[in-house]
Design a protein with these regions (language model features):
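Conserved S-adenosyl-L-methionine
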Residues: 72-176
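Non-catalytic, mostly N-terminal accessory regions of nucleic-acid modification and defense proteins
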Residues: 1-93, 152-160, 165
Length: 177
């Protein structure tokens, strides 16, 4: 729990986002140990863009979580091949990118990868989004922070139809599924 507070102190974007309930007695210590082992045993060798090892690990965990959740997973996870296709069709090299139901932030992550892979400048786009689910909104905040992607996801989770966090936004690209 102290580690989470320390991370939030160093990264203001994550303030009040990270869970701080790992010290509770009912937490399955064996399961927590398995998660720690999973991260401990990851090969930290260079595979192309080595700075994204943690991001790729997070994406892998999201996909496995989505697999376990079955049909409900569509609420926060879109398969990367679908997201990649959307981004390649739109080619968001510069401007404002908006995802009104951003889930875990996959559209923004893929947009950043697309720009980097094509020699573009990630600082030429601005990412905007929101999500109604509080847990999913926090997952997006963490996903983007891990990857160093700046985005305005609103000050809190909110439903786009009933509480638009970006009512004045004039987006150049809108990505949603």
């Amino acid at each position: 729990d102290d580690a989470m507070r320390g991370i939030e102190k160093e990264n203001k974007r994550l303030k009040d986002i990270l869970p701080k309930n790992f010290a509770r007695p009912e937490l399955d210590k064996r399961r927590l140990g398995e998660v720690v082992d999973l991260f401990t045993n990851i090969q930290m060798i260079e595979h192309g863009n080595s700075k994204d090892i943690l991001g790729r690990t997070y994406e892998y965990c999201l996909s496995k979580f989505a697999e376990q959740e079955g049909k409900l997973a569509g609420e926060f996870y879109t398969p990367s091949c679908v997201v990649r296709t959307l981004v390649e069709v739109l080619q968001p090299f510069n401007g404002r990118v908006y995802d009104p139901c951003c889930g875990s932030g996959g559209m923004f992550v893929q947009s950043a990868k697309f720009i980097e892979n094509h020699g573009g400048n990630i600082n030429k786009i601005s990412a905007f989004g929101q999500d109604s689910n509080p847990t999913t909104w926090k997952m997006a905040q963490m996903n983007l922070a891990i990857r160093g992607i700046e985005a305005d996801l609103g000050k809190f989770n909110a439903d786009t139809f009933f509480n638009d966090c970006h009512p004045q936004l004039k987006a150049d690209f809108i990505m949603a599924n």
